[in-house]
């Protein structure tokens, strides 16, 4: 029954992933087992540590792996929330845009902004407004 349902979904255009964070995919690989169990607010610091050293290429690799994995599961469309802040600047957004273009024939990628640092701080808001 599940096989039949899956095939009907694929025949009707495929699965849709309505909420993803492809720029953060696979970043936990760089965290220790202890760090992976920290509270969410502490994990944000770990993400900042990752983002401090991540290049556009790093983000492209994460996003591309995610897209290929999604395609493998029958997903044909996704909305990914990309970090835009004072650490990432535009790196994750540029990478997501690049991968959107690269896979446009096979995968419909929508890009949304993740405002994890908020918009009340003038610097954070300025960076966000530059890219949306």
Label each residue range with its predicted role.
Residues 1-13:
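Histidine-rich, glycine-flanked metal-binding segment
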Residues 16-19, 47, 78, 90:
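Generic intrinsically disordered, low-complexity segments enriched for polar/acidic and small residues
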Residues 19-21, 39-41, 103:
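Histidine (H) residue identity feature
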Residues 13-25:
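Histidine-centered catalytic micro-motifs
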Residues 51-132:
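Active-site loop-helix segments enriched in His/Asp/Glu that coordinate
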């Amino acid at each position: 029954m599940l096989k039949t349902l899956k095939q009907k979904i694929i025949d009707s255009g495929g699965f849709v992933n309505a909420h993803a964070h492809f720029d953060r995919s696979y970043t936990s690989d760089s965290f220790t087992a202890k760090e992976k169990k920290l509270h969410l607010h502490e994990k944000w610091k770990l993400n900042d540590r990752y983002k401090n050293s991540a290049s556009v290429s790093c983000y492209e690799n994460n996003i591309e792996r995610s897209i290929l994995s999604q395609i493998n599961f029958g997903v044909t469309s996704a909305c990914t929330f990309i970090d835009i802040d004072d650490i990432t600047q535009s790196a994750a957004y540029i990478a997501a845009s690049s991968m959107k273009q690269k896979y446009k024939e096979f995968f419909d990628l929508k890009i949304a902004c993740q405002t994890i640092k908020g918009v009340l701080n003038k610097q954070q808001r300025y960076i966000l407004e530059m890219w949306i």
